[in-house]
Amino acid sequence: MRSCLWRCRHLSQGVQWSLLLAVLVFFLFALPSFIKEPQTKPSRHQRTENIKERSLQSLAKPKSQAPTRARRTTIYAEPVPENNALNTQTQPKAHTTGDRGKEANQAPPEEQDKVPHTAQRAAWKSPEKEKTMVNTLSPRGQDAGMASGRTEAQSWKSQDTKTTQGNGGQTRKLTASRTVSEKHQGKAATTAKTLIPKSQHRMLAPTGAVSTRTRQKGVTTAVIPPKEKKPQATPPPAPFQSPTTQRNQRLKAANFKSEPRWDFEEKYSFEIGGLQTTCPDSVKIKASKSLWLQKLFLPNLTLFLDSRHFNQSEWDRLEHFAPPFGFMELNYSLVQKVVTRFPPVPQQQLLLASLPAGSLRCITCAVVGNGGILNNSHMGQEIDSHDYVFRLSGALIKGYEQDVGTRTSFYGFTAFSLTQSLLILGNRGFKNVPLGKDVRYLHFLEGTRDYEWLEALLMNQTVMSKNLFWFRHRPQEAFREALHMDRYLLLHPDFLRYMKNRFLRSKTLDGAHWRIYRPTTGALLLLTALQLCDQVSAYGFITEGHERFSDHYYDTSWKRLIFYINHDFKLEREVWKRLHDEGIIRLYQRPGPGTAKAKN
């Protein structure tokens, strides 16, 4: 190297400058091949590929962050009245992310088209700069931290709700909202749905669609305070669906070993400013004075389900309860299609509304069951002497007028009980429901087949449901084509759950057969009469000594009453006796040791 430098010194100055210039030119052309500037402006194709790759990574990430608990449970509730004294331990097991993570699946119909676009735009922009929000799990949650992707929240504590509660008429605020991140970074945000823990005492409005930073009509957004870190879980994300699409993941009865008891179990829908009785001897007055009944009886419940009482928040709340006490496992689009066809009931207290203003008259009602105790009872004239007469299911009158009377004001039924009665008793004269311009129909909605029956009724089509395979007729035939919708009433699931929780909570609900239990149709009808009437007399219901009588008053031969597991006849017998002893109802009880013989 030194020899080369020594030789270069002997060259002329012009040659040396020429060599130096050549070396510089060489380096100028060779340098870019060694140092390449990173490409900061990718092509459209490269950008798309990068976004897809990052999206897949963000979707896979929550799975690794999910808690390792054996069972992950959540609770979601819309604003409803607060819990009362009958609330028991909470033991829900599953509320899957697919169910509550799909805001679009439960968005109002008019916003269905907007939801996928909004959500897609939020998920595809600058995923590396997303700031996600977290939701709370149960008190046994995992370590606090931030989780990416769509998350869903739960809170075992009951939230504040600004509605009327139970007997106390207290007001509280239970809130559920769908939230967005507090700041948009890179114009991106992920959405989440959360139940605010009781400790935060926030008043957030529920929304019906996916929330974004831009305020939309009818949509309220809120931010989870960043200072409070709560235990969290990151459930796997779910695709957007519309409310009319059946969801893959949802609350299922099979996931519960006994009836789930939610912290909003005792929150019901109430009628504010309803009519009040002026009868001094009314059931409602007696109930308020009874040490036993004053803790159970709620006089201002919403009794009927109609288009005014069906919305997204009600669906979300009632989906936690199995039919007939809620909407669990039902088809949203079917229920919506049916219920929204029923006009609002002007007054829940139908019978009080029929009285002149200021009237002190007491409304008397007879509720006629189908028990064999009425055979040869000669109670027909007494039954007809009441202001209103309630009947149910196979209300066979022809040939039994002396025992059961002839008048009908209310007819209660389920799709199953009505179609079975038409099938079994059709050849004995029960070819249609009781008819008359003043007859009102009370439909107790047991489950899917009842909504399928109603759909066929409203469309005037033949019932094709496999759940009613024995009835291939148009439901309107049972009403002789003279049905008026203002006289066809659907009983509200809240009202039926109130009956079950406060009067007829069977031990069956605490076991494996909880799903099939419900009070008898007669029991539901009798407790409905307690809400509508001032004075109630019950005929044909189970009493002590029921073994002496046939199953039904219209049986042509003696049949033993069978205690099926889906009903609790012993419990009902005890409740009717207690109501009778308290002077709330007058229960017809047949004296004497003899067995009543069936008519031929």
UniProtKB/Swiss-Prot annotation:
Changing R391Q: Found in patients with inflammatory bowel disease; likely pathogenic; impaired localization to the Golgi apparatus; abolished protein sialyltransferase activity. Residues 84-94, 151-179, 209-219 have a biased composition (Polar residues). Pathway: Protein modification; protein glycosylation. Its EC number is 2.4.3.3. It catalyses: a beta-D-galactosyl-(1->3)-N-acetyl-alpha-D-galactosaminyl derivative + CMP-N-acetyl-beta-neuraminate = a beta-D-galactosyl-(1->3)-[N-acetyl-alpha-neuraminyl-(2->6)]-N-acetyl-alpha-D-galactosaminyl derivative + CMP + H(+); a 3-O-[N-acetyl-alpha-D-galactosaminyl]-L-seryl-[protein] + CMP-N-acetyl-beta-neuraminate = a 3-O-[N-acetyl-alpha-neuraminosyl-(2->6)-N-acetyl-alpha-D-galactosaminyl]-L-seryl-[protein] + CMP + H(+); a 3-O-[N-acetyl-alpha-D-galactosaminyl]-L-threonyl-[protein] + CMP-N-acetyl-beta-neuraminate = a 3-O-[N-acetyl-alpha-neuraminosyl-(2->6)-N-acetyl-alpha-D-galactosaminyl]-L-threonyl-[protein] + CMP + H(+); a 3-O-[beta-D-galactosyl-(1->3)-N-acetyl-alpha-D-galactosaminyl]-L-seryl-[protein] + CMP-N-acetyl-beta-neuraminate = a 3-O-{beta-D-galactosyl-(1->3)-[N-acetyl-alpha-neuraminosyl-(2->6)]-N-acetyl-alpha-D-galactosaminyl}-L-seryl-[protein] + CMP + H(+). The chain crosses the membrane at residues 15-35. One of its GO terms (biological process) is protein glycosylation. Residues 46-55 have a biased composition (Basic and acidic residues). Residues 36-600 are lumenal. Coiled coil: none annotated. Disulfide bonds join C279-C362, C365-C533. It comes from the Eukaryota. Residues 1-14 are cytoplasmic. Its main location: Golgi. GO terms for molecular function: alpha-N-acetylgalactosaminide alpha-2,6-sialyltransferase activity; sialyltransferase activity. Glycosylated; autosialylated. Glycans are attached at N300, N311, N331, N375, N460. GO terms for cellular component: Golgi membrane. Keywords: Disease variant, Disulfide bond, Glycoprotein, Glycosyltransferase, Golgi apparatus, Membrane, Signal-anchor, Transferase, Transmembrane, Transmembrane helix. Expression is restricted to the gastrointestinal tract. Highly expressed in goblet cells. Also expressed in various tumor cells. It is linked to Inflammatory bowel disease. A chronic, relapsing inflammation of the gastrointestinal tract with a complex etiology. It is subdivided into Crohn disease and ulcerative colitis phenotypes. Crohn disease may affect any part of the gastrointestinal tract from the mouth to the anus, but most frequently it involves the terminal ileum and colon. Bowel inflammation is transmural and discontinuous; it may contain granulomas or be associated with intestinal or perianal fistulas. Protein sialyltransferase specifically expressed in goblet cells that plays a key role in intestinal host-commensal homeostasis. Conjugates sialic acid with an alpha-2-6 linkage to N-acetylgalactosamine (GalNAc) glycan chains linked to serine or threonine in glycoproteins. Catalyzes the formation of the sialyl-Tn (S-Tn) antigen, an antigen found in intestinal goblet cells, as well as ulcerative colitis (UC) and various cancers. Belongs to the glycosyltransferase 29 family. This is Alpha-N-acetylgalactosaminide alpha-2,6-sialyltransferase 1. It comes from Homo sapiens (Human). The gene is ST6GALNAC1.
